[in-house]
């Protein structure tokens, strides 16, 4: 691969963006970045704390800056936060600076993959399924709008999905 390309993974919570992203980066010899981990690194606090102290709006401001910074790099795989897609600025940066891969999954899989994860502030409610359905209604059309490639992640291992992405991108 003479030209260093960026691959940006978008999709809902529990789609496997971070896990698949790590495999993809390793297989393609690219740097891996996770926007949520970068926010935690810069703030010295976990995402739940940022949400508690700054609210979702404060978190989204940080997320927009982190994604802007990371998408300036070359030769990376970036796992974005599930809600980052709602920012027009982030959508524009992702579309302009790399290949956008939408990791699609079902609500059932999201529930199964996230039910014990206390680090997801939006799901710390009585009915996380209802929240996930509501988020999907708003976000799924945005994922589809900017995706160069759509890959289903439901019944496959992260490594298999990473291989499918490589195949679809012709790398």
From Swiss-Prot:
Q: Give the UniProt entry's GO cellular component terms.
A: cytosol
- Listed EC numbers: 2.7.1.71
Q: What keywords would UniProt list here?
A: Amino-acid biosynthesis, Aromatic amino acid biosynthesis, ATP-binding, Cytoplasm, Kinase, Magnesium, Metal-binding, Nucleotide-binding, Transferase
Residues recorded as binding Mg(2+), renumbered to this chain, are 18
Tell me the compartments it is located in: Cytoplasm
| GO molecular function annotations of the record | ATP binding; magnesium ion binding; shikimate kinase activity
**PROSITE patterns noted in UniProt:** SHIKIMATE_KINASE (PS01128)
Could you say which residues bind substrate here?
Answer: 36, 60, 82, 139
Residue positions binding ATP: 14-19, 120, 156
InterPro entries per UniProt: P-loop_NTPase, Shikimate/glucono_kinase, Shikimate_kinase/TSH1, Shikimate_kinase_CS
* Domain of life, per lineage: Bacteria
* Pathway terms, separated by semicolons: Metabolic intermediate biosynthesis; chorismate biosynthesis; chorismate from D-erythrose 4-phosphate and phosphoenolpyruvate: step 5/7
Q: Name one Pfam family in it.
A: SKI
User: Is Zinc among this UniProt entry's keywords?
Assistant: no
Q: Which GO terms describe its biological process?
A: amino acid biosynthetic process; aromatic amino acid family biosynthetic process; chorismate biosynthetic process
The record's cofactor note says: Binds 1 Mg(2+) ion per subunit.
Q: Which reaction does it catalyse?
A: shikimate + ATP = 3-phosphoshikimate + ADP + H(+)
| Chief localisation class | cytoplasm
The entry's function note states: Catalyzes the specific phosphorylation of the 3-hydroxyl group of shikimic acid using ATP as a cosubstrate.
**Subunit composition?**
Monomer.
What NCBIfam families does the record point to?
A: PRK05057.1
Q: Which family does it belong to?
A: Belongs to the shikimate kinase family.
The name under which this protein is listed is: Shikimate kinase
- Species this protein is from: Shewanella pealeana (strain ATCC 700345 / ANG-SQ1)
């Amino acid at each position: 691969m003479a030209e260093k390309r960026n691959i940006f993974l978008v999709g809902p919570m529990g789609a496997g963006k971070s896990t698949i992203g790590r495999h993809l980066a390793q297989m393609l010899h690219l740097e891996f970045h996770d926007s949520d981990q970068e926010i935690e690194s810069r703030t010295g606090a976990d995402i739940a704390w940022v949400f508690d102290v700054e609210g979702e709006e404060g978190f989204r401001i940080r997320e927009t800056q982190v994604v802007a910074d990371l998408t300036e790099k070359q030769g990376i795989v970036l796992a974005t936060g599930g809600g980052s897609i709602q920012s027009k600025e982030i959508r524009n940066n992702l579309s302009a600076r790399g290949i956008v891969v939408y990791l699609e999954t079902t609500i059932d899989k999201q529930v199964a993959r996230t039910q014990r994860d206390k680090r997801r502030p939006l799901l710390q409610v009585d009915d996380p399924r209802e929240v996930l359905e509501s988020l999907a209604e708003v976000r799924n059309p945005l994922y589809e709008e900017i995706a160069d490639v759509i890959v289903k992640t439901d019944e496959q291992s992260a490594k298999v999905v990473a291989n499918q992405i490589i195949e679809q991108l012709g790398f």
